[in-house]
Design a protein with these regions (language model features):
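A glycine- and charged-residue-rich anion-binding loop/surface
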Residues: 1-341
Length: 341
């Protein structure tokens, strides 16, 4: 909400009487900024809003989401997400800065239907206004942890994103009962997150080390960032020699020993790519992207990629790195697996 408020303040300075519907839609769809809050702020400043444009963009967005939605194969479950997204909008992700947060339960799902409550022993899904839990994406698995209200404890076993930025917490209620509207405390498994951050940052260093050792034709084709290992798929036509593997490991470990800062910036995709950031998979990016860099800017970053994952603050937090296997998974695509101490 803080970022959305800043954007709204900047846009208000540019207008005379009416805020463009495109701005209100971006605030709602990208930052989870409620429309009624935008309206209240505008009203207090005697300003209006282009509601027609906002609602047209909402309609177009819903139609596009339904067109592109692959779903689970269960139409009754899939339809739920559209109804929830229409009602509550996007979930605000706090996990880049926080390991825990307070939130409000906006929706509960039990037995593939929306429910007003969960009782002890129930398995279900929970959606809140905000969360520090990272949802599985970009190869990085989701966080685990707990969501609680006093002695009422919901154990999170998985977290996925639906329809863009709707964070769905899967799990079971271990004790007590909870209901829609409850204020709760969200806590991720900090040790597990620390391992995920280290492996994700190691993946970036591995990617750049592969490119520097094998050639610039190396491009990421897939990855798995788990709390106990990493797997990296990339374009390359032949097996990596033992000498090349030693060089790759040395490059990664040298950068770990340098303990250089890991920085993140928010930029437009065009500006990021002009700065040398790598983008992958032919992905479609929004108006703003998160750029993760390792190294010193004045000396040219060692690694710069577009990435929405979580990362260490300094490369020294990664620990010793070692590739443990390589294999061919398709024509022209190889896989490397690695561990860290």
């Amino acid at each position: 909400l803080e970022r959305g408020m800043g954007i709204l303040d900047d846009e208000i300075k540019k207008i005379d009487k009416v805020l463009p519907g495109e701005v209100a839609f971006k605030l709602y769809d990208t930052y989870g900024f409620p429309l009624d809050l935008t309206e209240d702020i505008l009203k207090n400043k005697s300003l209006g809003l282009d509601h027609d444009k906002f609602h047209k963009l909402m309609k177009d967005s819903k139609e596009l989401a339904k067109k592109n939605w692959k779903g689970s194969g269960d139409s009754s479950v899939d339809e739920i997400w559209f109804g929830i997204k229409d009602k509550i909008g996007s979930t605000e992700f706090l996990g880049y800065e926080s390991n825990q947060a307070e939130g409000v339960i906006l929706s509960l799902i039990k037995n593939n239907k929306q429910s007003e409550n969960l009782k002890e022993g129930d398995e279900g899904m929970m959606i809140l206004n905000q969360t520090p839990f990272y949802a599985e994406s970009g190869g990085q698995v989701g966080d685990l942890g707990t969501i609680s209200n006093g002695k009422n404890i919901f154990k999170v076993s998985d977290i996925q994103k639906k329809l863009g930025n709707l964070f769905v917490h899967y799990g079971s209620l271990k004790t007590g009962s909870i209901k829609v509207g409850d204020a709760v405390e969200l806590k991720i498994d900090i040790e597990r997150r620390a391992n995920l951050k280290a492996y994700h940052s190691a993946t970036h260093l591995l990617h750049e080390s592969l490119r520097r050792t094998l050639g610039k034709h190396v491009m990421q084709k897939g990855s798995l960032v788990a709390p106990d290992r990493l797997r990296f798929d990339f374009s390359h036509m032949k097996p990596i020699t033992n000498e090349e593997l030693e060089t790759i490991d040395k490059l990664v470990n040298d950068y770990v020993k340098n303990n250089t800062e890991v920085t993140t910036r928010i930029m437009t995709p065009k500006a990021a790519i002009e700065k040398g950031a790598l983008a992958f998979f032919g992905e479609k990016y929004g108006e703003e992207v998160r750029v993760v860099s390792m190294g010193k800017e004045k000396e040219a970053y060692f690694s710069t990629e577009l990435c929405g994952g979580t990362h260490v603050k300094n490369t020294g937090d990664i620990g010793k790195f070692k590739t443990v296997s390589q294999s061919s998974i398709a024509a022209g695509v190889r896989r490397v697996e690695a561990l860290r101490d």
